[in-house]
């Protein structure tokens, strides 16, 4: 791959005083006499060894090894080497960085990166000069932006969109689905188009064989279940996710979304209350116990590998197994919901399902000794060629529009959902950490309620669900503001 000079990648317009107030204070030796920052001056630090933190899937599937090998070859003339940071993917940069144990470059979700930015542990970046700048979704860039003293800074470089997707087995569809499960005659199974049909199919499949299920999901998981609330008017924080005094999990008709969760749970078992399904979904989808589940695009390769193994265990050759798995494992955007909020209402208008989502990307630690070499690595890793390879090996949904147009299909649909605000991005502030426990507790409780006896049920009406969501909102507010 051709190396492009990074001499143009500089921060010549940002006074060091502003930067010092925003991110980790820069040593005085890194500020020039005119008061301009020279952190990113394009002068590659020869001999640099860049510690890069990647996610576990990229490492286990071999993508990361190929990436750093290619980078090291491309930058061998500078004696610059990228290595695996060899730390947990959830490393605590705030505590590790100052002591030299943290990575130079980290790949994380936008909410994690921006919490580091808020606490001054990563650098704002001169992103306009990166190869990916003009081709990357504006919504994705926004996920890494923060305003300080009237100036907008970007503290991360987007790589891929994370959002819930429906995974299903095409070979587990009923043989007569085109006659009995395609009401609008569009050659798409009804159970893939609407949650109402998926619930009906799930009930029928389990009735025919009590050991098998249709759609299965860990409903307690806020990341996957919050979208049902958002679809009916809920939100996380007001003012574009910046006003933590305005918490919106009970807003609009959010209780309809909570009711949807309960209706879906009625065709599952009690494993839907906790994370059991999250951990078993790969093997259960592969062995046919589940017809469908919900997960994120970046684990497509894991589902695929499990299905390949299942076919091989049935006696298929490796080549046959791979071909069958690629054909029968399908990842699509989520089905539509009834506007009425009742999955048994066949007459209702349909609405799109909104989802919680995030943007994963790269950032640079404020504690690195090699900012320019680190920026060179990010520029290399987010190039067209390497994002295509990341897609091919991991099944991600890229944030580069040129790659998305090349791939097409469901990837393009997800990209459009991001641009059209059907993906509700996780807030880029520290307050987001307070939403998980109250919402997970609520989702687990309303799911468990489905399996309680009638006399023990806590949520018998939509009003009960509304009151439960209002309590969740208060709990989040208390957690955010009590110690202020």
Question: What annotation goes with each model-predicted range?
Answer:
Residues 149-160, 164, 193-253:
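Extracytoplasmic/periplasmic solute-binding protein
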